């Protein structure tokens, strides 16, 4: 997980980026993907949050992040591997963002 932007300052002196007003889980890019999708998400306040990947049958494949997050703009990449490090097959997968105040699931497609 990487924090994309300092929520208070831009790289340009004197320019400020406001904190997000609400939770947002964006569609991964690229989609379809091969080999690595990037998942962007926004968090309006400091909170514990997780992002997990599920197969089309609902089986949890891997947890990408499960930790305390600062408010701001974040992203995480998935290497298309399961929790044991095995490469997963092509197909439909779902990623789910979950915090105390927000749950959102989106679909992505892995091409092999």
Annotate each PLM feature:
Residues 6-29, 33-53, 63, 75-78:
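Glycine-centered coil/turn sites that cap beta-strands in beta-rich domains
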Residues 2-8, 89-112:
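C-terminal tail/sorting-segment detector
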Residues 55-56, 82:
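Short, acidic, Ser/Thr-enriched surface-loop or helix-capping motifs
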Residues 42-44, 81, 98, 111:
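Solvent-exposed residues in well-ordered beta-strands and their adjoining turns
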Residues 32-34, 57, 99-101:
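A generic beta-sheet turn/junction motif
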Residues 65-100:
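Short, surface-exposed loop/turn motifs with a glycine/proline- and acidic-biased composition
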Residues 59-65:
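Surface-exposed loop/edge segments in extracytoplasmic proteins
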């Amino acid at each position: 997980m990487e924090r994309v932007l300092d929520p208070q300052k831009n790289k340009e002196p004197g320019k400020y980026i406001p904190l997000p007003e609400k939770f947002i889980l964006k569609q991964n890019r690229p989609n379809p993907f091969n080999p690595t999708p990037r998942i962007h998400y926004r968090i309006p306040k400091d909170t514990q949050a997780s992002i997990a990947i599920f197969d089309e049958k609902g089986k949890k494949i891997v947890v990408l992040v499960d930790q305390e997050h600062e408010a701001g703009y974040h992203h995480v990449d998935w290497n298309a591997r399961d929790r044991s490090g095995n490469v997963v097959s092509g197909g439909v997968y779902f990623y789910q963002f979950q915090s105390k105040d927000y749950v959102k699931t989106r679909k992505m497609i892995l091409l092999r």
